[in-house]
Regions:
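Secondary-structure capping and boundary motifs in well-ordered enzyme cores
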Residues: 117, 154, 191-195, 346, ...
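Hydrophobic alpha-helical transmembrane segments
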Residues: 63-66, 157, 187
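Membrane-anchoring hydrophobic segments
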Residues: 2-3, 8-119
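Hydrophobic alpha-helical transmembrane segments and immediately flanking/interface helices
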Residues: 131-143, 147, 178-198, 255-281
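Transmembrane alpha-helix detector for multi-pass membrane proteins
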Residues: 72-86, 101-175, 195-207
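Eukaryotic, compositionally biased intrinsically disordered regions
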Residues: 595-607
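Soluble C-terminal extramembrane regulatory/interaction domains of multi-pass membrane proteins
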Residues: 207-596
Length: 607
């Protein structure tokens, strides 16, 4: 588990909110953090969304308006002094006396006007804030209302307006023929002045409070605080903390869904990113949670995300300590399904964040969460194939392959770092690395399965994309000297089995091109036996077809693809070294020498 102070220090980089609101978004109480006292986790998981504007936002308009009013008042008084009578009635002493010693009629006139102004200020503040909050709640999530009226600053300002109004009413009511509340009149004047001065900063606070990114950040921080390991009696309130975390996840999802319906891509992206940050930060600290935290309570079991699961599936989530990750990924699945018909860019972002969630789990050794990420990637692929959405499937495969690459590299990194350790520790690390790298094999195996599904549904391009992605993953495993390479290669060479045409004689051209590309990579790095293994798999191919593919690969000189896409490069691009190895590879096919390659006008070359 990461130290609490490190989490607090890194929070600014992990939560998608403005810097002004990050001050309140920590995983420990404010006072304890200032003292550096580790006992701060003994307290209850209180809400940390006490949003505050910078002091300058309040002080600058207040001082500016007050200063201007004072200058005008002093100027008017000075002009009165200059143009007043010579009897000396216009003086500072007389001004002070007039303010402090009013008679009954003067006090009643003053308080009558003050009462009306104070009521107007209070009504204006309540009306404006209520309308704005209601509009924001309709646009984002109803939870905004509770956040707003729970904010300390909002309660203080509205409470001040109400108190000032009540005070003015009481002072006005207390005036009688024999009693003049001179100081009450003066305080009423001061309270009205303060209320008017606070009005504009308060409106600025309300608008800033309802900024979408800050709302998302505040909800995220509140949910994260409920997931933070604590000690003492507060740690036993597991149900309350689970409810707080679940509500945060669901509120973020509602924001994303509402934004999708309104075609607001930026807000939807912020909510999706926040869910990813939530899952990653929670994963870093969940090892310190009580065992009771990982159970699924009956009230939680009845929620839509768990109610349809079998008892065995719920038991697996409990034993693997992944119920909250399941909850978050289920929200991703729901937003993904909505995004397929609304804003497809959101689907790409969900794939990216699912990859990030899986990568974070792999780095900390949480294989169960990594398996969940892989499972949901498969679910995304199934949804896109069922919807015949080629472009979305293309982009999801890109992220899926990158997750597999990261798993391979992380496994090799673990082995390298263990070289300086004892023999026993090295064996343990090797076993963990082997278990981790098995997930890369799973990724390749699942990809091959979905290539068959896509091919049967007529999505030929997706089948070819999967072949290139598995080939790239195989190359990464080869360069990393991973023990899972041979198994990934076996899966890669079996991709063509699922993409043969109906007469079982013709394999997809893109699959063969991907295999040739991998073989040239082997040859460039001296692995002739592996390249020969690829050639043996292609020995039944028609020579004319092989010659056409040789020509296509040899004449493709541009790495960058000519259209805008996430990958940005041509699948079939070969480096100059790989092109040199083409002759070596095709020499294994009798009768197919380099001198026999001729220009074939039927081949469509890429730029």
């Amino acid at each position: 588990m990461e130290p609490r102070d490190k989490l607090a220090a890194d929070l600014a980089d992990d939560l998608p909110v403005a810097a002004s609101s990050l001050m309140a978004m920590t995983l420990a109480p404010e006072g304890d953090r200032m003292r550096g006292d580790e006992s701060g986790t003994d307290g209850p998981p209180r809400m940390v969304g006490q949003y505050k504007l910078p002091l300058r936002t309040w002080s600058v308009p207040v001082l500016a308006i007050l200063g201007l009013a004072v200058v005008i008042f002093v100027l008017a008084f000075w002009l009165n002094v200059l143009t007043g009578d010579s009897d000396g009635t216009t003086s500072a002493d007389n001004l002070v006396h007039a303010l402090l010693y009013q008679d009954v009629d003067q006090a009643r006139n003053t308080l009558g006007g003050l009462g009306e102004v104070m009521a107007a200020v209070l009504g204006l503040a309540l009306t404006v804030s209520s309308i704005i909050v209601q509009l924001a709640a309709t646009r984002f999530t109803p939870h905004i209302t509770s956040l707003f009226f729970r904010a300390r600053t909002n309660l203080l300002v509205l409470g001040f307006f109400v108190t000032a109004t009540v005070f003015v009413v009481w002072v006005n009511f207390s005036i009688g023929d024999n009693y003049v509340p001179r100081w009450g009149v003066l305080f009423s004047m001061l309270l009205m002045t303060a209320s008017l001065l606070l009005l504009f900063p308060y409106f600025a606070y309300v608008f800033d409070f309802l900024d979408p990114e800050k709302i998302v950040g505040r909800i995220t921080a509140n949910g994260l605080y409920a997931c933070t390991p604590i000690r003492g009696k507060a740690a036993q309130a597991v149900d309350e903390r689970q409810l707080q975390a679940i509500e945060a996840v669901e509120h973020l999802t509602n924001i994303g869904l509402n934004a999708l319906q309104q075609k607001d891509k930026n807000i939807a992206s912020s909510a999706i990113e926040a869910l990813c940050k939530f899952a990653v930060l929670y994963g870093e600290t969940k090892a310190g949670m009580l065992k009771e935290w990982h159970r699924i309570a009956p009230w939680n079991r009845r929620s839509p995300d768990f109610v349809s699961l079998s008892h065995e599936a719920v038991g697996d989530l409990r034993e693997r300590c992944t119920w909250l990750e399941w909850k978050i990924l289920r929200q991703y699945q729901m937003v993904f399904t909505e995004g397929l018909t609304q804003i497809k860019d959101v689907c790409y972002l969900i794939a990216i964040d699912t990859r990030r969630l899986g990568e974070a789990a792999a780095k900390r050794g949480d294989l169960h969460t990594l398996d969940l990420s892989i499972k949901f990637f498969n679910t995304y692929l199934r949804a896109t194939i069922n919807a015949n959405d080629i472009r979305t499937a293309y982009n999801i495969l890109h992220q899926y392959r990158q997750l597999g690459e990261m798993v391979v590299n992380e496994g090799r990194s673990m082995v390298r770092k263990a070289r300086s350790k004892s023999e026993r520790e090295q064996r343990e690390v090797l076993e963990r690395a082997k278990t981790l790298e098995r997930r890369a094999v799973d990724v390749a195996r699942f990809m091959r399965y979905y290539s068959s599904v896509a091919f049967k549904r007529g999505m030929v391009f997706i089948a070819e994309v999967i072949a290139h992605d598995i080939g790239t993953l195989c190359a990464v495993a080869f360069h990393a000297e991973s023990r899972c390479h041979d198994e990934i290669l076996r899966i890669f060479l079996a991709v063509d089995d699922a993409t043969e045409s109906a007469d079982k004689e013709k394999t997809l051209r893109g699959v063969r091109l991907a295999q040739i590309k991998l073989a040239t990579d082997y040859l460039v790095h001296g692995s002739v036996a592996l390249a020969k293994q690829v050639a043996d798999d292609m020995k039944a191919e028609d020579h004319k077809r092989l010659r056409s593919m040789w020509q296509e690969l040899d004449k493709l000189d541009t790495r960058e693809f000519w259209e805008v896409n996430d990958r940005g490069s041509n699948f079939d691009y070969l480096t100059p070294e790989q092109k040199t190895a083409l002759a070596h590879f095709f020499a294994w096919f009798p009768g197919l020498g380099y001198e026999q390659v001729e220009d074939d006008p039927s081949v469509v070359l890429r730029p």
